[in-house]
Regions:
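Solvent-exposed beta-strand/loop surfaces of large extracellular or lumenal domains
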Residues: 21-46, 65-71
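Hydrophobic, well-ordered secondary-structure elements that form the walls
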Residues: 15, 26, 55-57
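Short helix/loop capping segments that flank catalytic or ligand/cofactor-binding pockets
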Residues: 12-13, 24, 66, 91
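Short, small-residue-biased leader/transition segments that mark boundaries at the very start
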Residues: 1-4
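Surface-exposed beta-strand/loop patches in extracellular or lumenal glycoproteins
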Residues: 9-18
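Surface-exposed, short loops/turns at beta-strand junctions within beta-sandwich domains
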Residues: 49-51
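Proline-anchored loop/turn motifs at beta-strand termini and strand-loop-strand connectors
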Residues: 18-21, 60
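C-terminal beta-rich recognition modules with glycine/proline-rich loops and embedded aromatic residues
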Residues: 38, 54, 58-176
Length: 176
């Protein structure tokens, strides 16, 4: 992100550093400068006395597993993935049918890879997870046993879901 400021009326500018960004590179008039994030979530940039200051910002974005407040009962013990300001979702086209059977290892490593969906270059996120398996045979009930298998989950930005055909989609999935 780049912006220009006239510095006749001010000597500093406060720029909001979003909580989703793990860091930010700041360049002032083409030179990288160090700026600390304040407790209130802003970085302060001293402006030069020249007429125009050019400020370039590059926010670092890493995928993060988030949880909802426990007061939101519908999402209790579930997690979602964000990267920067984007919310991600899990589609059946990538993860198979019966999305309800998926679980996410919340402490697992998240991997990103560039892909194209609907003509847009995006970051796809891959995560370790599980899929519950069905009971064998046609019986309605059986002896309980651990019926999960490890799987690699694929998440895409929410705004792009349902662009590759109809199917199931979930944002919040159970945590393993």
């Amino acid at each position: 992100y780049t912006t220009l400021f006239r510095s006749k009326d001010c000597s500093k500018i406060a720029i909001r550093h979003p909580a989703w960004s793990s860091g930010v590179k700041v360049k002032k008039n083409g030179r990288e400068i160090f700026c600390e994030r304040s407790e209130s979530g802003y970085i302060l940039v001293d402006l030069d006395t020249q007429e125009i200051n050019r400020i370039d910002l590059e926010f670092q974005m890493e995928p993060i597993v988030i949880a909802a407040n426990r007061k939101i009962s519908y999402d209790a013990r579930k997690a979602a993935i964000i990267m920067g300001p984007l919310l991600y979702c899990f589609e059946s086209i990538d993860n198979g049918s019966e999305i309800e059977e998926l679980g996410l290892y919340a402490q697992g490593e998240l991997e990103t890879k560039r892909n194209s969906i609907a003509g847009k270059e995006i970051n796809t996120i891959y995560a370790k997870g599980t899929r519950r398996r069905e009971l064998e045979g046609d019986t309605l009930y059986g002896v309980y046993q651990e019926m999960k298998e490890d799987v690699k989950l694929t998440a895409i930005p929410y705004f792009l879901w349902n662009n590759r055909g109809e199917g199931e989609m979930k944002v919040w999935i159970p945590v393993e």
